[in-house]
């Protein structure tokens, strides 16, 4: 009986050792990480997919894991011949995105709610929805084909550049933190800047403005508004609304550009208006095509 008991105990120990060995072997070969496969289904654009596979560490296994998603806060995919950023929605921790200089026609960033910086300039965008990106402080969407831009939900915006689009209007009344605004080369007929008290730099050249009121922009230090349609009393009002500059250096007031022909410059700034601007510390300037620089503008006779 004793021998039988000893044999049974030995068998139990052997089996136990086998179970332990099996468990140890399993722990040495964990299951593959769960995540998003970097494939054509999830990232249909071959250039975007190639960039992810070749330029980021997760390209080694072709899987975008949850840990990698949480650590990816910046993506720089500029000038990569990308036509679609489908798949960008998986990067939910993304804070900074540069996708400029590509061939992108549409951009869905509704899932990228942590974005603070977006450069999507020099693409072929006709629409841009940033209503879910309330944390954006910098939005650069220059050189596109946008006919409208709603930034009413982007109250944290400090820098907005929508240069060279097809905009006919732009509402920035909710963007009270704006410091720099560039809306050159659009078709905007009026702009309300009364709530933008922190604005320091304004580019609104080559639009269709007939009036411009800067009386609520006491921190303004730079104004570019050439090739609009501001003249006469409206030019008087514009100059009268410029904030007083009490520093030793003139602030730039780029008001005239005849480089595209005199007929394309709708602004008129007379000699007396030039003197009125200079009395407030602003130097009216015109573009010199020969010197390729901005020079002091003497003013027109009438």
Where are the regions that the model predicts?
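N-terminal capping/linker segments that flank leucine-rich repeat
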Residues: 4-6, 13-14, 19, 23-98, ...
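Eukaryotic tandem repeat interaction scaffolds
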Residues: 182-184, 196-210, 217
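Conserved hydrophobic position(s) of the canonical leucine-rich repeat
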Residues: 72, 94, 104, 115, ...
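Canonical leucine-rich repeat
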Residues: 85-88, 107-109, 128, 149, ...
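Conserved hydrophobic beta-strand positions in leucine-rich repeat
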Residues: 73-77, 97-99, 116-120, 137-141, ...
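Consensus "Asn ladder" position of solenoid repeat domains
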Residues: 80, 102, 123, 144, ...
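A detector of helix-start/N-cap boundary segments at the beginnings of structured domains
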Residues: 34-42, 106, 148, 169, ...
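Right-handed parallel beta-helix/beta-solenoid
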Residues: 109-113, 130-135, 151-156, 172-177, ...
């Amino acid at each position: 009986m004793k021998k039988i008991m000893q044999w049974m105990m030995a068998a139990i120990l052997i089996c136990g050792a086998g179970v332990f060995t099996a468990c140890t072997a399993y722990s040495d070969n964990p299951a593959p990480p769960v995540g998003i496969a970097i494939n054509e289904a999830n990232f249909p654009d071959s250039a975007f997919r190639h960039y992810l596979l070749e330029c980021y560490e997760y390209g080694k296994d072709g899987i975008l894991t949850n840990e990698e998603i949480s650590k990816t806060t910046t993506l720089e995919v500029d000038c990569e011949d990308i036509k679609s950023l489908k798949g960008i929605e998986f990067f939910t921790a993304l804070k900074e995105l540069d996708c400029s200089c590509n061939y992108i026609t549409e951009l869905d960033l509704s899932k990228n709610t942590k974005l603070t910086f977006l450069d999507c300039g020099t693409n072929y965008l006709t629409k841009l929805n940033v209503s879910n990106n309330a944390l954006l402080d910098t939005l650069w969407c220059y050189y596109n084909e946008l006919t409208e831009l709603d930034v009413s939900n982007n109250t944290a915006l400090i820098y907005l550049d929508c240069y060279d689009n097809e905009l006919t209007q732009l509402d920035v009344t909710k963007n009270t933190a704006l410091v720099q605004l560039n809306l050159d080369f659009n078709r905007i007929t009026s702009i309300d800047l009364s709530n933008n008290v922190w604005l320091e730099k304004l580019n609104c050249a080559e639009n269709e403005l007939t009036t411009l009121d800067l009386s609520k922009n006491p921190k303004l230090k730079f104004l570019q508004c050439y090739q609009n349609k501001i003249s006469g009393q409206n030019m008087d009002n514009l100059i009268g609304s410029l904030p007083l500059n009490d520093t030793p250096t003139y602030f730039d007031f780029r008001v005239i550009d005849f480089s595209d022909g005199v007929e394309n410059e709708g602004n008129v700034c007379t000699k007396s208006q030039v003197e009125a601007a200079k009395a407030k510390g602003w130097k009216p300037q015109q573009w010199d095509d020969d010197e390729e620089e901005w020079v002091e503008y003497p003013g027109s006779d009438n």
